[in-house]
């Protein structure tokens, strides 16, 4: 980020390539709408570009990037006042980003992902968000706290409650 802030365009290309798939996957899972996820994805990167000159390395770039995404999601939900239903093919769209699966394996994985998705949809938004940031983005508790604006213990509590509810939902 420092190299790009200093004017190195190749550094931006490297940052974008390194973080685009994780960021888009996070947004798609939160929004459950491909077109809206793409729109907010572009908006997040536009905000990164706009803020490049004033960026301070207080945290890792990925933490800063996901904090921007978190704030942008909150703006969207505040404006929309609702969460749209998940499109039926959201998992397939995300799976299309990956290669190498047989049709049988994809069907089995799809069924398993669908069960997990249903259980995750039943989680409160705060618990679902911290669970996705921890499991999918592999962020630390401190990074999740910075992104969501809550303390480490609150993050731990939300993760624990989310896992308990997820287990109960999958075992039902």
Task: Give the label of every model feature segment.
Residues 1-22, 29, 104, 121, ...:
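N-terminal module of bacterial RNA polymerase sigma factors
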Residues 83-109:
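Internal acidic/polar
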């Amino acid at each position: 980020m420092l190299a790009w802030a200093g004017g190195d365009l190749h550094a931006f290309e490297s940052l974008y390539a390194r973080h685009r798939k994780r960021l888009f996957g996070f947004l798609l899972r939160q929004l459950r709408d491909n077109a809206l996820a793409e729109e907010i994805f572009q908006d997040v990167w536009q905000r990164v570009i706009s803020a490049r000159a004033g960026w301070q390395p207080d945290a890792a770039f990925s933490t800063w990037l996901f904090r921007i995404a978190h704030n942008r999601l909150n703006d969207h939900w505040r404006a929309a006042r609702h969460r749209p239903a998940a499109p039926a093919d959201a998992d397939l769209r995300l799976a299309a980003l990956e290669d190498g699966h047989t049709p049988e394996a994809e069907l089995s994985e799809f069924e398993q992902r669908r069960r997990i998705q249903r259980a995750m949809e039943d989680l409160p938004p705060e618990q679902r968000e911290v669970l996705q940031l921890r499991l999918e983005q592999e962020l630390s508790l401190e990074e999740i706290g910075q992104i969501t604006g809550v303390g480490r213990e609150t993050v731990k509590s939300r993760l624990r409650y989310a896992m308990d509810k997820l287990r109960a939902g999958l075992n039902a």
